[in-house]
Each structure stands twice: as C-alpha cells, then as structure tokens.
C-alpha cells in the first residue's frame, strides 16, 4: 500500500511538471530580428519590416498566427528547453548572425540565451518555419 501512495505522488508531481512547461511562453528572435512568440499551441510570427531593418531593404514577410498540434508544440518546446539548458552554443553578446531565445513562466521567471549558428538552432528554426506553413 505504501508503494501505491508513492506511485500516486510521483504521478502527481510529473503531471504538475508537464503543466509547468505548458504555461511557459517563449520568444525567438532570429538573426534578422524576426520574432516568433510561442505559447500554448500557438505561434505568432512578427517579421521585421524593411523600414526597421539595418539594411533598409530586408523584409521578413507577412505577419502570421498559427495553431500547432500538441505533438508539434511539444517538439518545439522540448528543443527550446534543450537550447536554454545547454548553453554550449551561447554567445556573450548579440552580434551579427546571432539569435536570441527567451522563456518566461507564469510567475514571470525569465531565461534567455544568445545563440551562435548551430545545428540545434537550425533545427529549431526549421520546426518554427514548418509550423508556420500549416
């Protein structure tokens, strides 16, 4: 009986951890300063306009908001968490060709990482762009 209650306690803790991740919001700013706001099952893309770009020419396209499946959302969040936790690809300051990933939870706890080009960053951008195509 004691093991049963221990098992139930573990399940409750794990389910709360899952809920914590769902309540996280992420913002990804790519190397061109296009912004991707990622919240529960939604990606909101806010591109930079030519008038805002350093070149005065680059335009990130049209704004778009999409709903993503739970599977896609979970995949995006899992990779975002890996990137935030493993700061191997972190740069100390924002320079050309870097991107920034931010996270904020429901208690307003914030984390961020400045990213140099890497395979994980490329994969993360690919997941976001694929989600926006749907």
Show the residue positions of the predicted features.
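C-terminal motif of bacterial Sec signal peptides marking the signal peptidase cleavage site
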Residues: 14-16
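Positively charged n-region of N-terminal signal peptides that target proteins for export
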Residues: 1-4
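Mature extracytoplasmic domains of secretory-pathway proteins
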Residues: 54-90
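Bacterial N-terminal signal peptides
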Residues: 6-12
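Short, well-ordered, aromatic-rich surface patches in folded extracellular/luminal domains
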Residues: 18-28, 93-134
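Post-signal peptide N-terminal segment of mature Sec-exported envelope proteins
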Residues: 25-44
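A short, structured beta-strand/loop element
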Residues: 41-52, 95-98
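Short amphipathic beta-strand/extended segments with alternating polar/hydrophobic composition
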Residues: 37-41, 59-61, 65-68, 108-118
């Amino acid at each position: 009986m004691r093991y049963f209650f221990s098992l139930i306690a573990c399940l409750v803790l794990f389910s709360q951890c899952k809920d914590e991740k769902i309540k996280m919001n992420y913002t990804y700013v790519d190397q061109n300063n296009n912004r991707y706001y990622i919240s529960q099952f939604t990606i909101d893309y806010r591109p930079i306009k030519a008038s805002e770009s350093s070149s005065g020419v680059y335009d990130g396209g049209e704004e778009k908001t999409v709903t993503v499946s739970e599977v896609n959302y979970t995949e995006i969040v899992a990779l975002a968490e890996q990137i935030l936790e493993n700061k191997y690809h972190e740069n100390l300051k924002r320079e050309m060709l870097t991107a920034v990933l931010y996270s904020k939870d429901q208690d307003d706890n914030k984390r961020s990482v400045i990213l140099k080009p890497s395979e994980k960053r490329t994969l993360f951008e690919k997941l976001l762009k694929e989600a926006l195509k749907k």
